[in-house]
Structure formats: structure tokens, C-alpha cells
Amino acid sequence: MTAEVNLAVELPGLKLKNPVMPASGTFAFGDLPENFNWDEMGAIVLKTATRHARTGNPQPQIDLLADGVMNAVGLTNPGAEVVASEKIPALREKHPDLPILASVGGESVEDYVEVAEILAAAKPDALELNLSCPNVSEGGITFGIVPEMVEKITRLVKEKVDLPVYVKLTPNVTSIVEIAQAAEGGGADGLTLINTLLVLHLDLKTRRPVLGNDFGGLYGQAVKPVAVRMVAQVKQATSLPIIGVGGINSPEDAAEFILAGASAVQIGSMSFYDKLAIKHVIDGLPAVLAGMGTSDVTSLVGQWQSNKQ
């Protein structure tokens, strides 16, 4: 019999019964499996909303690999107004005790602020800034790779909304620590990392990319070592709580992220293969933590030890 293990975690704006939640986009705006008790999750993270509705990128948008998923969906969503007026209220009515993180996207700094204000009016528990969107006014460069832009967007959003703000970091940078510190400087309440790795997969017969948008984002088991490394580095360099994401397929994977420095975790790609992946991680986590000699999940956060010490 597994010893009693406390999985409860408190983060800014979030009281989680356990540290496990879906990554943004996994279950859209609450489209969860019917054979799963939604309230067993620590929280739900919504798909990214933009100022106006988006139909997404050309097909194909998804490429399933042996050890991961490539996607170039293009932030398909009905627009922030619909998410705020319909999606969030409907989810709140069905699951009043389930913490909600609303994901914010944009094509300009002004977009991010406006979308954040629109979503905040629907009273989710927190916002997650998806800074992996392209900055249209600057030739399409990704917002999240420029420290000054990360700091600016975070600061402006924080000035306009009375909600905790978590900044989701792109791994496609030279220094993830520099980006994390920029978010902290802008007043972020927490960090989510990592977003997808920019990749290209070519079809040898057609000599063309497999994805309709050419380049895509890779997530799944293949990116886990990168994500764990970045979580560990950011934990050592900032004081912000971290939500870790990237290739979590099992309770052991979740525990590894927590050991590296994550206070909570998100699961994305595994849910494409197993709709109950989140439930399996939640159910299996107590035994894994007990086996590590831990009776409270919070006591494990960031407790890895370097071989160099």
C-alpha cells in the first residue's frame, strides 16, 4: 500500500489539488474526454486566444512521429471575445472548482494587452502569455526571443489586468535564462516552459515539407531532456514558480520535472495517443514520490543535486 502523499500545490492565483494539467491546446477550450472526471486535474489551460478568430495554417497541420508530435496548427481559435463570453463561462459553470488558465496570443504588443484585458474580464484564475507568436510589425520575428519585448509585454499586461500572469517561454533562444529574467523583470507571477522546438521534416519523395506551413513546432518525448535542462537552469536563475512542460509521458517524467524545479507540470502530446494520459500521471504520481521518500510533492521541487558538487 502506497504511503499517503500530499499532491496539493499553491501557486499565484492557483490552488491545485495536484500539480498536473493539460498544456495549452491539448483540450481546446474544454473539450475533455467524457470518460474522465475533469475535476481530477489540478487545472485546465485553454487554447491560445487571439484578438480575431483564426482558421489556422494550411493542411497538413499535424505530423505524428515515433517520439513526438510536430504541429503547425496556427492558433486556430474563435477569437478572444467568444472565448471570454462563451467558452470560459461555460467551463466555469460545469466545473466551478477547476482552476482555469486562459492563454493569450497576439500579432502586436497592443494585441497582447487587449486580448489579456478581454480574457481577464471573464475571470479565469490566471493568464498564460504565449510569446511564441510572430511580431507582424517587426517582420515576423517571434516575440519571445527578444528579452526587451518579453519584459515589455509582461509589464504592460500586468499593468492592465488584476490576475496572475504566467509567461510561456520559447526554447528557440540562445539563453533561456535571459528570457526568463526578462519576464521576471516585467512582473511575471510565474513561468511556463518550454514551448515547442522549431523544426522541419522533409518528404524525400516530394522534396517538400510534411507540414503545410513548412516549419512546425516539436513537442513530445523527444524534447524532454531539453525541457528538463531549461527548467533546472531557470529555477536556479529566478525566484518565480515554474510550470514544466515538454515530453511528459509518465508519473516518472512528471517527478523528474519537479525534481528539476517545476512546481507543476503540463501534459500535451501524450494526450494525442492516450486521452487519459493525464489521469494516469495523476494516479501514478503518489507511488513514484513515495518511492523517492517524499510525502509532500512541494518538498521535491528543485532538489536535484549536481555531480559536480
Question: What annotation goes with each model-predicted range?
Answer:
Residues 1-3, 218-239, 243, 249-309:
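Alpha/beta catalytic cores of nucleotide-metabolism and tRNA/nucleoside-modifying enzymes
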Residues 1-100, 106:
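N-terminal capping/small domains of soluble enzymes
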Residues 14-17, 94-100, 160-165, 236-240, ...:
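Short, surface-exposed connector motifs at secondary-structure boundaries
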Residues 20-24, 42-46, 100-104, 127-129, ...:
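Hydrophobic faces of well-ordered beta-strands that scaffold small-molecule active sites
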Residues 33-35, 57, 116, 204-205, ...:
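Short amphipathic alpha-helical segments
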Residues 51-55, 134-136, 198-201, 272-274:
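Short gly/pro/ser/thr-enriched loop/turn and capping motifs at secondary-structure boundaries
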Residues 92-95, 123, 161, 285-293:
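Structural signal for hydrophobic packing residues in well-ordered secondary-structure cores
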Residues 107-243, 252-260:
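Alpha/beta enzyme core
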